[in-house]
Amino acid sequence: MKYHDLRDFLALLEKQGELKRITLPVDPYLEMTEIADRTLRAGGPALLFENPKGYSMPVLCNLFGTPKRVAMGMGQEDVSALREVGKLLAFLKEPEPPKGFRDLFDKLPQFKQVLNMPTKRLRGAPCQQKILEGDAVDLTRIPIMQCWPEDAAPLITWGLTVTRGPHKERQNLGIYRQQLIGKNKLIMRWLSHRGGALDFQEWCAAHPGERFPVSVALGADPATILGAVTPVPDTLSEYAFAGLLRGTKTEVVKCISNDLEVPASAEIVLEGYIEQGDMAPEGPYGDHTGYYNEIDNFPVFTVTHITQRDDAIYHSTYTGRPPDEPAVLGVALNEVFVPILQKQFPEIVDFYLPPEGCSYRLAVVTIKKQYAGHAKRVMMGVWSFLRQFMYTKFVIVCDDDVNARDWNDVIWAITTRMDPARDTVLVENTPIDYLDFASPVSGLGSKMGLDATNKWPGETSREWGRPIQKDPEVTARIDAIWDELAILNDGKPESDR
């Protein structure tokens, strides 16, 4: 499913009945959130608010409101095909030379996709059709949503932040929320371990007192946005990965005021800088946990230039207690994670991040257990292998006879195969999401692993329970007379209804 930019993608959605245009005036203050929330919970379409109250710029919401649309954004027809994206990423993380002619033939599609990795640099681009600078820069003219009643101010949610550390060729792309505090100022809420924050720290060390260049793309194409939230190998840029997903090279253009490269077809680009030491209190905001988070200090992003397309569209979302758009993204990206984990840990059968667990705070893993202590090794692997699971507080490991996506199965395994003292692993003083107010210290807390597997010799000295199995011959005999019994059919055999 190929597309060029966000507008091209919206046209595809509209053809499939996946986009609804809202012509009635709707207020970005709370009203858009209410409509988007109801629509998402009903599995409804993406929403294009064409007449935001008080603004002339349309607002796009709920773009990734269903797993199907996430898959479409990644160039796939359905969610099941995302496993192929995961296999490609697993291959790129640890590429292996072909083992023979047949293996070479099997890997040709992967090698062909790699041809779309290099970016294409343009001299002029749609995102620079209009250029605003100086006093003309006014962020309040953008219909930035305020999502919840006690939010501190309007909040940019889908800003694709572009940074580059000193002496680095590769740029970093990250999604960081940004609080509006003035006509040309935003607060950049990036956590200390994120790529943008690390680039800034390195810049401050290498260039004391100098301004740090930053650009933010709003309304980039879906593949580029999704590339910024996917476990891309460190050797692969997000732009290159977006090209793989889209099937065409990512087009970029150099910014007007700095050397950063942004998506050429983005709807809006904010260019500016962060002054070292310029901090401001951010929040509170309702977030994906379903609570308002605490106030904390983060760097101030000063916007010097706004470039945009003619008739630009502002792309936004809201976050709240699941289900919300990040939770839906988590459900879809779960399918990408599975092959990557299986490449490193072949014993993993399935991996599931329940959306009600805020998408990443709890994981259920099923394995083909091979030795005593195996479950604990897998726990440690999940916590350490991908940085996306750095904040996963709970890891439950079960045998492969358990369906990781069925709570009835998982709870049965926990309550029948676990001894709390023996089979619970607690790890203290580990990195924790700064939004997790339950941790004793901001950004630092504990993790729990639950070994809900059958226990092997060395893990127990007792005779282990044997699962009850039905007699297949009896089951077959009852299957043959079940309709005639008419137990669940209002007393009438199937043939008489």
UniProtKB/Swiss-Prot annotation:
It is an enzyme of class 4 (lyase). GO terms for cellular component: cytosol; plasma membrane. The active site is at D287. Transmembrane segments: none annotated. Pfam families: UbiD (PF01977), UbiD_C (PF20696), UbiD_N (PF20695). Prenylated FMN binds at I175, Y176, R177, R189, W190, L191, R194, G195. It is found in: Cell membrane. Its EC number is 4.1.1.98. Its cofactor is prenylated FMN; Mn(2+). PANTHER family: 3-OCTAPRENYL-4-HYDROXYBENZOATE CARBOXY-LYASE-RELATED, FERULIC ACID DECARBOXYLASE 1. This is 3-octaprenyl-4-hydroxybenzoate carboxy-lyase. It comes from Enterobacter sp. (strain 638). The gene is ubiD.
